[in-house]
Amino acid sequence: ESQAVARVFPDGVPCSSTKPMTGHTLGAAGALEAAFCWLSLTHGNTLAPHVWDGQADPALPALRWVTPGQTLALTPQRCLMSNSFAFGGNNVSLIIGDAP
């Protein structure tokens, strides 16, 4: 996933994972992450911080991990992407943002 993000998005796009804060909720994971995205857009632009051990994998591209208190850039049309990859190849990328 990090390789795809590094190829598709510009350098410096904020990245995070909510699973360390919620646990492995299986079928509810996508709904929870969508709720985090919606909250970021509607309550002060605060992004969910990336909680991790700080040990980057040198085989993967460096990404800009969201830090506590970091906010979404104020742009004319804000949007967030939530990726959900599940058992059996059930995958989805949900884009949530301001109406045009």
Predicted regions, residues:
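Short beta-strand scaffold segments in enzyme catalytic cores
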Residues: N91-I95
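Structural signature of cysteine-dependent C-C bond-forming condensing enzymes
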Residues: S2-M21, A29-A86, G97-P100
